[in-house]
Curated annotation (Swiss-Prot):
Gene3D superfamilies: Aconitase, domain 4. The gene is leuD. Catalyzes the isomerization between 2-isopropylmalate and 3-isopropylmalate, via the formation of 2-isopropylmaleate. This is 3-isopropylmalate dehydratase small subunit. The keyword Amino-acid biosynthesis applies.
Length: 163
């Protein structure tokens, strides 16, 4: 799983309410959710993001309520994955469950607008000639993401046995 795209950089403590604000969150349709992603903190985001782009953040990305809509909106926009220093636990699970890869680590070396090539399985991020390393998901969680999420994983494998 290697992707190339532009970095969209956010700070610390980005809540699910900032990703998909509750007052706009009146649908479960991913295409509609995509239109409201970050609408209050970065109004240009949904219009300008391209498939393969990467969300990068500081600490506690996706904290707050258990809105699956936050992860669904990012996936519907074609976000390749999220790199952050830490994640809200519910967002972390929601992202994996719908097939969004995540990397953990210090993100100060990545700036808004950087063009990066990300290997989501090894944690290697290439920015020009520079290589940054992040912590990838553990193997079992990577398998779920590779399959496109937990439902596809179950459909294809028939169980949730950890090997």
């Amino acid at each position: 799983m290697i992707t190339t795209g532009k970095v969209w950089k956010f700070g610390d403590d980005i809540s699910t309410d900032e990703i998909t604000p509750g007052r706009y969150n009146l649908t479960k349709d991913p295409k509609e959710l995509a239109k409201i992603a970050f609408i209050e903190v970065r109004p240009d985001f949904a219009r300008n993001v391209r498939p393969g782009d990467v969300v990068v953040a500081g600490k506690n990305f996706g904290i707050g309520s258990s809105r699956e809509s936050a992860a669904l909106a990012l996936k519907a926009l074609g976000i390749a994955g999220v790199i952050a220093e830490s994640f809200g636990r519910i967002f972390y699970r929601n992202a994996i469950n719908i097939g969004i890869p995540l990397l953990l680590g210090k993100t100060e070396g990545l700036k808004d607008g950087d063009l990066v090539t990300v290997n989501w399985e090894t944690g290697e991020v290439r920015k020009g000639d520079e290589i940054l390393m992040f912590e990838p998901l553990e193997d079992f969680l990577l398998e779920i993401v590779r399959e496109g999420g937990i439902l596809e994983y179950i459909r294809r494998r028939g169980d949730l046995c950890i090997r």
